[in-house]
């Protein structure tokens, strides 16, 4: 059975970058891929310095935002990574198969490690945990952006290595499902949209707050005057139109920009109207969840139960193939208790 898994870090409430780059696609995929699993990956959020209270609030904000954006607990499992301890168990197993050099060559590791004096081991092992996140559920498809392809290749390589070492075709080699929306640039037009850079628009922001951020946003740098013809293909605002506006509106914006019929402010005002139309229902659902927080807790609890069921079965089978079958002690009789399968593998006495 085909299975989809994807995760997102708990950065708090969603912004339009991760909404367009991932979550909007998840909402569509849950309709075509029953049983999809979507995870708030909080273990990935602790590779650097963090405040526990802030992390707790961000996990909640992300879960609420995902539900408000359209993730349906009746169609997909939404859960928090740390609620399923098997993630870290499988991650440790995979570290025994992963060459150090493969991790040091990861682009994101080289970029992030160059910005810190002391490099935490967790930063290096980040893609190993990511491989475990995916393979724990034996997912064969992973919706990702282009910046995650290298990490997914490591997961595919890990699956091949484990299968070869233990003589089993157990783990699938997950394939990428590239997000239809191209990489979303920040409002400054210089880098990827990111909360840490302050170049985002939050999904829960009001109509006025959206306009306040769109007004100074970067457009075509060569269009200095309103009478100058524009180049929509290099304008970040036009890319947002393609994500939020109707096709006929996008075509109108393209023509008005190229002919200098509209100025950039005209274009931005139309974009704001398109964004408000799509985001207002999401804000409304988020407000309803704020009023009934138990709905968020129930969704996460149900998702975690589903995820744990799959994860436990995977780890039971993985341990068996690896010779790590569980051994327990029956305290009442003080005798060794184990499965018949384990006993049958014990070496006979000389």
Predicted regions and their residues:
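Short helix-capping/linker segments at secondary-structure and domain boundaries
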Residues: 100-104, 136-143, 245-253, 283
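A generic secondary-structure signal for well-formed alpha-helical elements
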Residues: 63, 70, 98-101, 139, ...
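Internal, conserved structured core segments that host functional sites
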Residues: 116-162, 185
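N-terminal Rossmann-like or analogous alpha/beta NTP/dinucleotide-binding catalytic cores
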Residues: 2-132, 283, 287
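Conserved nucleotide- and phosphate/pyrophosphate-binding catalytic cores
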Residues: 16, 150, 156-335
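Single conserved hydrophobic/aromatic residue that forms the stacking wall/gate
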Residues: 332, 336-350
């Amino acid at each position: 059975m085909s299975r989809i898994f994807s995760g997102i870090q708990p950065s708090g409430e969603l912004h339009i970058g991760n909404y367009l780059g991932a979550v909007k696609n998840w909402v569509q995929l849950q309709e075509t891929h029953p049983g999809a699993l979507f995870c708030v990956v909080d273990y990935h959020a602790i590779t650097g310095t963090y405040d526990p209270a802030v992390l707790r609030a961000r996990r909640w904000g992300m879960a609420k935002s995902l539900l408000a954006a359209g993730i349906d607990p009746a169609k997909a499992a939404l859960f928090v990574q740390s609620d399923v301890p098997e993630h870290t168990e499988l991650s440790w197993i995979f570290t025994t198969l992963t060459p150090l050099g493969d991790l040091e060559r990861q682009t994101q590791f080289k970029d992030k490690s160059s910005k810190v004096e002391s490099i935490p081991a967790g930063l290096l092992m980040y893609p190993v945990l990511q491989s475990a996140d995916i393979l724990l559920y034996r997912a064969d498809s992973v919706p990702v952006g282009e910046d995650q392809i290298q990490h997914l290749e490591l997961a595919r390589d890990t699956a091949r290595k484990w299968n070869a070492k233990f003589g089993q075709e157990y783990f699938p080699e997950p394939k990428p499902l590239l997000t239809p929306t191209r990489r979303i640039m920040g409002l400054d037009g210089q880098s990827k949209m990111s909360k840490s850079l302050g170049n985002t628009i939050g999904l829960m922001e009001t109509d006025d707050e959206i306009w306040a951020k769109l007004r100074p946003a970067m457009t075509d740098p060569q269009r200095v005057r309103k009478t100058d013809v524009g180049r929509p293909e290099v304008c970040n605002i036009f890319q947002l139109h393609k994500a939020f506006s109707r096709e006929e509106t996008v075509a109108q914006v393209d023509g008005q920009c190229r002919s200098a019929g509209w100025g950039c402010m005209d274009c931005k005002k139309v974009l704001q109207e398109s964004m408000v139309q799509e985001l207002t229902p999401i804000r409304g659902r988020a407000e309803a969840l704020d009023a009934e927080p138990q709905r968020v807790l129930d969704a996460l609890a149900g998702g975690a139960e589903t995820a744990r069921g799959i994860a436990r079965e995977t780890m039971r089978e993985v341990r068996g193939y690896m010779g790590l079958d569980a051994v327990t002690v029956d305290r009442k009789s003080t005798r060794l208790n184990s499965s018949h399968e384990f006993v049958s593998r014990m070496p006979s006495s000389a």
